[in-house]
Amino acid sequence: IKLFMGSSTGNMLVDKMNSLLNIFNGTDMLIAAHCEDQETIKNNIEKYKQKYKGADDIPVSAHPSIRSVPACYASSELAVRLAKIAGARLHILHVSTAKELQLFSDEPLANKNITAEACVAHLLFTLTHYNSLGARIKCNPAVKRKTDREALRTAVNSGLIDVIATDHAPHLLSEKEGGALKAMSGMPMIQFSLVSMLELVDEGVFSLETVVQKMCHAPARIYGICPVSYTHLRAHETRSN
C-alpha cells in the first residue's frame, strides 16, 4: 500500500487520523509512506505568501523551508508510532532530513519491521544547488541542507537507510518553470540513478557492494520479490563467468 501522508503531485493525500488508523490496523501488507505534515506545510506557505505579498510566486529556494524539516519529521514520527502500535510493516519513502534518522534502527534488514529509503536527489544535491539548477531540483520532500545530505549518506553506510530509490517523476521543462508554488515537483531519475551512485562510489562515498545492496537486494527483500531478483542476478553472474 502506498500511502501519501503528505500531499505531492496528484490528489492522493490521506491525513485524517481515522483513515490512518484503519490502514495501519487493517492490513498485513507493507505500507510505503510518503511523509510530510500537511498542516505544517500549509502554515509555511501562508508565511511565505505574506513575505512575498504581491509577488506572482515564491522563490524556489524557499521550497525546503516550506516543506521543512519539522514537516518531514512530524509525519514520519507519526507513521512510525502508528506502525509500532499496530505491529504493521512500514517503509518510509524519500527520507530527506538528518532528524528523521533517529526514528530508524541499524539492525540487520531481516530483523526490521520498519525500514527507510533515501532518494538519489537527496544524496546528491543541497540547498546551494537551487542557485544554479532552480526548479529543476524541486521535488517532494525538498532537497535540504548539506548537513542533511551528509547524514543521509552516513545512514546509507551504517544501515539506518535500507534502500536507495529514484522517486522517478519526469515533467516537461515548461512544467518546471516558476517558483516554489508553480513549478511542478519531481525529477527524471531512472536513467541517471545508477550512473550517479557509481560516481559516488568513485568519490569514495559508498562502496560498490553498498550500492548493489541498497538499490537491488534490499528493495527485493522489502517488497517480497526476492526470489525473482536473486534468480536473475545469479543467472547473469553465471553467464558472465
Task: Explain the meaning of each model-derived region.
Residues 231-238:
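Conserved small/polar residues in nucleotide/adenosyl-binding loops
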Residues 2-164:
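Histidine/acidic residue-rich metal-binding segments in metalloenzymes
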Residues 66-70, 181-186:
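A short glycine-threonine-serine/GTX helix/turn-capping micro-motif
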Residues 98-99, 121-122, 169-173, 217-221:
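Short, catalytically relevant binding-site loops at active-site mouths
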Residues 81, 198-202:
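Short glycine/serine- and small hydrophobic-enriched flexible loop segments
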Residues 182-196:
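Gly/Ser/Thr-rich active-site loops/lids in small-molecule metabolic enzymes
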Residues 199, 206-228:
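Mid-to-C-terminal alpha-helical segments outside catalytic/metal-binding sites
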Residues 114-118, 160-181, 187, 235:
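Short acidic/histidine-rich active-site segments
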